[in-house]
Amino acid sequence: MTKTKTKKAKKSRRNIALTAVSGVVLGLTLPLTATASTAPTALRAKPLDWTKCEGSGFGPRQECATVDVPMDYADPEGEKIGIAVSRIRSEKPAVRRGVLLLIPGGPGGSSLEEQSAKARTLPREVREAYDLVVFDPRGNGRSAPVSCGFEQRDLAATAFRPWPVGPDGSVAGNLTAARRMAGACERNGGELLRHIDTVANARDVDRIRAALGERKLSAWGVSYGSYLGAVYNELFPHRTDRFVLDSNLDANADAHGGQVARGLWAGFEQGVEDVFPEFAKWASEPGNPYRLADTAAEVRPVFLRLAARLDREPIPWPGAIPAELNGNVLRQSLLDAFYDPEGFPAAARLILAAREGTVPPAPEPPPEALLQNGLAVASATFCNEGKWPASAARYQKEVDESRAKYPLTAGMPRNATLCAAWPYPPKQDSVRITDRGPSTVLMVQNERDPAAPLAGARELRAALGKRAVMVTVNATGHDAYLGNGNACGDAAVTRYLATGERPARDTYCR
């Protein structure tokens, strides 16, 4: 595999994920145990009807099918929805050992075509060892897609990511937007919106496993997919074979009032701080055509002063959403650039233009239908899990504290999302990840990740205990394996998937 190919596949899916929610991030009345859920699934599984995949972006060896699952697992005999899946058979059937499921991030915004391109970048020994299977999670893409019909202004990344509306950090405008967006979901989202959450996604994954006729499942989950993979390991521990969790999210629900999603948002505070020194070092290098300052120490005040100025005096930006370059758009653009160091030049160009009172050409937005679908899936996944705070005073206090401690993110990670006004009762609290079950997990984690900071990955590592080994990679950006990691980390993951050999203990890849 060449780095160029893997980068292209990764960037394609990253751009869509960023538009929807970035990586960052989720019901049942019966006990969430493997005993209650795995055996009946296996008995009811129907053989899949594989056909040629329709549409562009699929390889010639690729097959597509649909797995029928309950819309509501509390009513398993009720209405069904179809989960779109795709398969690329092992390139060497004589050594095939099972299925490797690619679990996408988001949540929301991925597509079967993009995940398929990612599968084709895997090293030869992995492509030989497994049938590679990808899927669109419920409500997403080809799997009964949902939409809230958000207003145009609410499709901006600075709207879904709740940057404080006013330059003083007031949350009042965000709560108004939350009510407007939640109302759109209630009017337009349909019944499925109430049944999109991480536990339902995990049960869908087990339905896919059963429909494939596999006793156990191997998987590679990235970003939100790392959390979904951890939940699957918790609910179906004896169905797991080799699991790779990549760019790991903080799954410590106890620290966030029973809600993993609030912790995922909060992770941006530390994640952006972790990456900024690398950006500052790059942006102060002599000879850099996008140099922002003479020293790395000067880059931070340059950025903060400019963001504050744009809060007060935004620059018109025709064609952009929103149609101005304000302080929050600048902050959001920097955060997006931090997902991949190759994005540093774009962020620096924007900063240089804004300092002169100008803007570059507006980036072309993704198709509106894709945005609407991704945002609706992300909203439901987050909001259906746990009861979110609704108090303006609580949000204001947390935002004020965050702005003081983490000025680069200006309070956004602690602000009110549309979940503060979500019209439906929560399905359940987040699943508590434990160390109970077989040792089948290899975690791979970049040291500097804006959306999945190392501190959060360590929380997940501690929760998994003896079930996991973690490889920490001396690298910057989101997506470690075959993305923004390094050769040492890539080799460790490939070796585990192909041979089952994991490092004996937690490892640091320089």
Explain the meaning of each model-derived region.
Residues 1, 351-355, 399-404:
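Short linear, low-complexity motifs centered on an aromatic residue
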Residues 1-38, 67, 205:
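Secretory targeting and sorting signals
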Residues 40-329, 380-510:
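Gly/Pro-rich cap/lid or specificity-loop segments adjacent to the active site
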Residues 350-351, 493:
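Generic hydrophobic alpha-helical segments
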Residues 315-331, 339-343, 368-376:
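Structural motif
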Residues 351-386, 390-393:
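Long, low-complexity segments enriched in small/aliphatic residues
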